[in-house]
């Protein structure tokens, strides 16, 4: 592969679509805390002055949707009408129904191992050894930029920052290896009374420089900080937000394929979410084992059927053993049936709200980021 550029973006927790994702996952967590076997498909819409929570939920739990919504928005930092959105005064509307019994009969089984997939679909997982967390560098550093924006906003270091922000970063590659950062874009909502010059200097010193490795920065690296010159109106006042609208930000920043299914608001019986996590787990363990430098896994399911309809391993010519052998190892060491992967990754816990901002992958404390199968895979592959 010759020289090329690759770009990924991220958005902060205060971006309207991410507010929606976090509310949906906060509702899911509250329900799973009381009822781990609940069926949850929770969708959220946010716009100036209002939040609408809808979907299909079947559970024995009772949760206060309004209070969960307000607390989530409060935690993000929208606590005053000056910001264009206020957790304390926004309207919260609920339109929740129950999961269709036609779906239930395909998912629930007397034998848990025969639990069927909650829907048909295809999911991808990916890993690469270009970063220490085995994630693509562009999306990893795009996330870290907006995470840093949140840190300095919440700590009071830059008190004029507001919750809505976006980042974008372009990396230079030569023969598949990173050689530098070509361009950095960071746009952040801000208070009315901060000058463009002061904002740009502070963002460079307090957000960009602490995050980006100096070895990838050079004299030709370009910076675009609030390039429109003004970003006072943001959050739900600037744009409406909807659950599931940031699926590339949530995954690999465009460097891997995507099956199209969103994650937030869905309990683990929905393979859109749980099988995508399992596919990441498989790919990461293959790369951690040194069996490939890059690995993409595809799995697919039929509604009501436990066994995956397909498993595909793609290693882009970086494999150390054949992809046929890798596929056999995946089938041997990973149970990718819905119940099997839920047990394998211990998914029936309220861990999802935190996934809903700054990426579902590459943060080591999530169970699908473990590399506990790497040594077994390496041994089974016959590599020393």
From Swiss-Prot:
Sequence segments annotated as region (Flexible loop): 99-109
Location within or outside the cell: Cytoplasm
EC identifiers of the protein: 2.5.1.6
The keyword Magnesium appears for this protein: yes
Cofactor binding notes: Binds 2 divalent ions per subunit. Binds 1 potassium ion per subunit.
Residues involved in K(+) binding: 43
Domain of life, source organism: Bacteria
Primary localization: cytoplasm
Record: residues binding ATP: 15, 164-166, 230-231, 239, 245-246, 262, 266
GO cellular component term of the entry, any: cytoplasm
Catalytic activity entry: L-methionine + ATP + H2O = S-adenosyl-L-methionine + phosphate + diphosphate
The protein's name: S-adenosylmethionine synthase
Organism: Erwinia tasmaniensis (strain DSM 17950 / CFBP 7177 / CIP 109463 / NCPPB 4357 / Et1/99)
Family note: Belongs to the AdoMet synthase family.
Pathway connected to this protein: Amino-acid biosynthesis; S-adenosyl-L-methionine biosynthesis; S-adenosyl-L-methionine from L-methionine: step 1/1
Binding positions for L-methionine per the UniProt entry: 56, 99, 239, 270
GO molecular function, one term: magnesium ion binding
Alphabetical list of Pfam families matching this protein: S-AdoMet_synt_C, S-AdoMet_synt_M, S-AdoMet_synt_N
CDD domains: S-AdoMet_synt
Function summary: Catalyzes the formation of S-adenosylmethionine (AdoMet) from methionine and ATP. The overall synthetic reaction is composed of two sequential steps, AdoMet formation and the subsequent tripolyphosphate hydrolysis which occurs prior to release of AdoMet from the enzyme.
Residues annotated to bind Mg(2+): 17
Cofactor(s) recorded in Swiss-Prot or TrEMBL: Mg(2+); K(+)
One GO biological process term: S-adenosylmethionine biosynthetic process
Subunit organization: Homotetramer; dimer of dimers.
Keywords: ATP-binding, Cytoplasm, Magnesium, Metal-binding, Nucleotide-binding, One-carbon metabolism, Potassium, Transferase
């Amino acid at each position: 592969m010759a020289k090329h550029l690759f770009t990924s973006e991220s958005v902060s927790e205060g971006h309207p679509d991410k507010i929606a994702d976090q509310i949906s996952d906060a509702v899911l967590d509250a329900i799973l805390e009381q009822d781990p076997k609940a069926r949850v498909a929770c969708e959220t819409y946010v716009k100036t002055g209002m939040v609408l929570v809808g979907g299909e939920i079947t559970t024995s739990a009772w949760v206060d949707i309004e209070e969960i919504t307000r607390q989530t928005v409060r935690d993000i930092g929208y606590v005053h009408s000056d910001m264009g959105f206020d957790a304390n005064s926004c309207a919260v509307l609920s339109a929740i129904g129950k999961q269709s019994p036609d779906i239930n009969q395909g998912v629930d089984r007397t034998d848990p191992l025969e639990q069927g997939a909650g829907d048909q679909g295809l999911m991808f997982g990916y890993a690469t050894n270009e970063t220490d967390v085995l994630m693509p560098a562009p999306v990893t550093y795009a996330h870290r930029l907006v995470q840093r924006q949140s840190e300095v906003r919440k700590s009071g270091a830059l008190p004029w920052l507001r919750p809505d922000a976006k980042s974008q970063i372009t990396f230079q590659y030569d023969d598949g290896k990173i050689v530098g950062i070509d361009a950095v874009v960071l746009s952040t909502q801000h208070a009315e009374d901060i000058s463009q010059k002061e904002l740009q200097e502070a963002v460079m010193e307090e957000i960009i420089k602490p995050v980006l490795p100096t070895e990838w920065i050079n004299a030709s690296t370009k910076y675009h900080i609030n390039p429109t010159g003004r970003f006072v109106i943001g959050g739900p006042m600037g744009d409406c937000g909807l659950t599931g609208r940031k699926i590339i930000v949530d995954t690999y920043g465009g460097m891997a394929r995507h099956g199209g299914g969103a994650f937030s608001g869905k309990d683990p019986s929905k393979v859109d979410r749980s099988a995508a996590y399992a596919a990441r787990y498989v790919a990461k363990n293959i790369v951690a084992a040194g069996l490939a430098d890059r690995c993409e896994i595809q799995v697919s399911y039929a509604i009501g059927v436990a066994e995956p309809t397909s498993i595909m391993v793609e290693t882009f010519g970086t494999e150390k053993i054949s992809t046929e052998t890798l596929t056999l190892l995946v089938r041997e060491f990973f149970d990718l049936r819905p119940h099997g992967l839920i047990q394998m990754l211990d998914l029936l816990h309220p861990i999802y709200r935190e996934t809903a901002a700054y990426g579902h992958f590459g943060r080591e404390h999530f169970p699908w980021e473990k590399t506990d199968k790497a040594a077994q895979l390496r041994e089974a592959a016959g590599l020393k």
